[in-house]
């Protein structure tokens, strides 16, 4: 007997999303729901290899969404202050575990915030911890809470070489931050100016190109050895930049890297759905309070944890590739990180449900991806 998964919707306000957002996202559902296919899909329990859960009271609001569907998630370290040491990662991990619902099996996989001053000794401590999987490279100023990030990759070489030696993974936010580079070109320029050189300098380093958004990134990843892989978000395969900008600005679709033109969306979608082991699921679910998004200077980030797997199912179904969802969501990431594939399964059923307009978020509210829209897939549990 399969029972509908009970997601933590207490306090969620079922308000309609802004009309412009409803129109943009409604077009996605109209396309997907017209695609024929099976009404039930069972896959190995998945992992999310890129997740933000924030800190303090906000953790308890968002962790249950992920923990009830995914067995593991790679937790980003860009809190305030950032998670820079193994000791800090352990303390953060305990906060996250305290927010996991009773009876739910979920293991947060931790990362350290790489800085110009991260030492080889800290890398050794991280590798010995058993719960730190890698270090996150944020170019200083590239995204939320990245001001303490890396100013020059060359300053990190001792730490990166130690990571390669010990098998820790480097997770990369792949954008330059030069004021002279156009916002939509930051990823491409990063590949040319930074990542291509890094791959050559530390050839044994395992690298994840996080939340790739361009055809350039897809081709770069494919051209590298098995030590380079990439994660892909739901918004970057379901939407292009028109969804955010045409007919009015939709702040809840603003994220970094920013949504790109349609040709890039098509290329990234093909990479995600095509069965290539180099690409795997990483939502980059990044909640912000509603007021911080609906602002004259709004924060970057899309909150998608409430329905992450159904969003990917929508995209894979649209491409006629539902049979490849399991590898993308459950196999490729675990294999790359060198951890066992999960035991157990998760089942999705084709059963539409209305996404709430808001969810409670640590005493505030967060507006989720596809707020107020009908989502055609639902996760159920055995």
Predicted regions and their residues:
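N-terminal chloroplast transit peptides
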Residues: 1-20
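Histidine/acidic residue-rich metal-binding segments in metalloenzymes
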Residues: 30-32, 37-38, 122-137, 145-281
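Histidine-centered catalytic micro-motifs
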Residues: 45-56, 170-176, 232, 283-285
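Divalent metal-dependent hydrolysis catalytic cores, especially in the metallo-beta-lactamase
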Residues: 48-49, 62-88, 103-115, 131-145, ...
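Short, acidic/polar
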Residues: 56-63, 117-127
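His/Asp/Glu-enriched, well-ordered alpha-helical/loop segment
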Residues: 274-341
